């Protein structure tokens, strides 16, 4: 039996709190446990044990939270703000290097690869076009 909540399919044997934490971006184990305790589900209740009103209560609870695309947009905006204000972590994002203090002498290849790729709409690299300005060259070289 498959249970559908907000367009996501859950197997019937899955534990509710683990299933919510694994399927929805922005919900971890702690948040999933809080949702279950708020709605009155016991800790290891499985998806196939839910009734239709309980499924609807989970859906209504999740619809009030910032999850999926909204949570990703917030992360993207935070990274863009760090770059814009010129913070150290923003600079590390721009240079495609590890942000959280990891060593880079040997093992930074993964961060370099992942920070260059457009991951779920978070693109970190842009190239500016350099244009020739004759008046600038005349000021520099005095011709």
From Swiss-Prot:
Keyword Magnesium (UniProt): no
Molecular-function annotations in GO: RNA binding; structural constituent of ribosome
GO biological process entries: mitochondrial translation
Compartments (UniProt record): Mitochondrion
Xref: InterPro entries: Rbsml_uS13_C, Ribosomal_uS13, Ribosomal_uS13-like_H2TH, Ribosomal_uS13_CS
Swiss-Prot/TrEMBL keywords: Mitochondrion, Ribonucleoprotein, Ribosomal protein
Subunit structure, as described in the record: Component of the mitochondrial small ribosomal subunit (mt-SSU). Mature yeast 74S mitochondrial ribosomes consist of a small (37S) and a large (54S) subunit. The 37S small subunit contains a 15S ribosomal RNA (15S mt-rRNA) and 34 different proteins. The 54S large subunit contains a 21S rRNA (21S mt-rRNA) and 46 different proteins.
Function: Component of the mitochondrial ribosome (mitoribosome), a dedicated translation machinery responsible for the synthesis of mitochondrial genome-encoded proteins, including at least some of the essential transmembrane subunits of the mitochondrial respiratory chain. The mitoribosomes are attached to the mitochondrial inner membrane and translation products are cotranslationally integrated into the membrane.
Membership in a protein family: Belongs to the universal ribosomal protein uS13 family.
Note, other: Present with 259 molecules/cell in log phase SD medium.
Protein name: Small ribosomal subunit protein uS13m
Gene name tied to this protein: SWS2
């Amino acid at each position: 039996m498959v249970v559908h909540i907000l367009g996501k399919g859950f197997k019937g044997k899955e534990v509710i709190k683990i299933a919510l934490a694994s399927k929805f971006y922005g919900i971890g184990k702690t948040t999933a446990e809080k949702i279950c305790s708020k709605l009155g589900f016991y800790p290891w209740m499985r998806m196939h044990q839910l009734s239709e009103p309980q499924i609807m209560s989970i859906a209504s609870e999740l619809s009030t939270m910032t999850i999926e695309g909204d949570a990703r947009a917030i992360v993207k905006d935070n990274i863009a703000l760090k770059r814009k204000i010129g913070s150290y972590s923003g600079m590390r994002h721009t240079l495609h290097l590890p942000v959280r203090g990891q060593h880079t002498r040997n093992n930074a290849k993964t961060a370099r690869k992942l920070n260059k790729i457009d991951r779920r709409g978070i693109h970190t690299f842009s190239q500016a076009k350099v244009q020739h300005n004759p008046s600038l060259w005349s000021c520099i070289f005095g011709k």
